[in-house]
Amino acid sequence: GANLLKIHDGGYVPVMIATAFTVIMWTWRRGTAILMEKTRHTDIPLSSFVSSIERKSDHSPAHVPGTAIFLTSDPESAPAALLHNLKHNHVLHDKNVILTIRTINKPRVAQEDRYTVEKVSDRFSRVELRFGFMESQNVSQALATLRKTGLKFDIMSTSFYLGRRKLVPDAKSGMPHWQDRLYIALANAATDPSDYFRLPANRVVELGSHVII
């Protein structure tokens, strides 16, 4: 009873703030789950993609010098930016790196635990970089240490490919329309990956796609 009286004396303000934060967090988690579920239906396993693309045929893409790094959250699937680049530009770089960046539940990561490198084929490698939650995620600097593994490339002749999704609300998404709009607004307000990961601005290529959520 005493706590109810405090609501009339301004106690409703922290209650409203807490409710707003709860709605925002729940919307973000729910919207992200829906988005991942929808994109999963169109994903192509990376191993299958590499096998098909490296099979010699009259339709093989042209090869260009240099290294292409494709950022993705799912290292098991061919990144959307890679697929769009092939579709529109019909080229494949000499070296292609599928890069995943993880933030782990530690303040900092020891240098020997910073990365793992997996060779998928002569042209494709899969790399995972790990950062602690207190570290600045300087990807260009971290990639320079990969030379120890034999994965050598000149950062200034390397192109970073990012997939950018334009989200479109769907009445059948599983969330109310206002929540669709809130999720899209939150996604649009997120930090630009090229800035967050400190990628050289003149080496970044963004390829967009429409996704209905």
Swiss-Prot record:
Membrane topology summary: Multi-pass membrane protein
Entry annotated with the keyword Transmembrane helix: yes
Compartment(s): Cell inner membrane
GO molecular function: potassium ion transmembrane transporter activity; symporter activity
Transmembrane segments annotated in the record for this chain: 10-28
GO cellular component, one term: plasma membrane
Keywords for the protein's UniProt record, in alphabetical order: Cell inner membrane, Cell membrane, Ion transport, Membrane, Potassium, Potassium transport, Symport, Transmembrane, Transmembrane helix, Transport
Primary residence: membrane
Organism superkingdom: Bacteria
Catalysed reaction equations from the record: K(+)(in) + H(+)(in) = K(+)(out) + H(+)(out)
UniProt family annotation: Belongs to the HAK/KUP transporter (TC 2.A.72) family.
Role: Transport of potassium into the cell. Likely operates as a K(+):H(+) symporter.
Protein name: Probable potassium transport system protein Kup
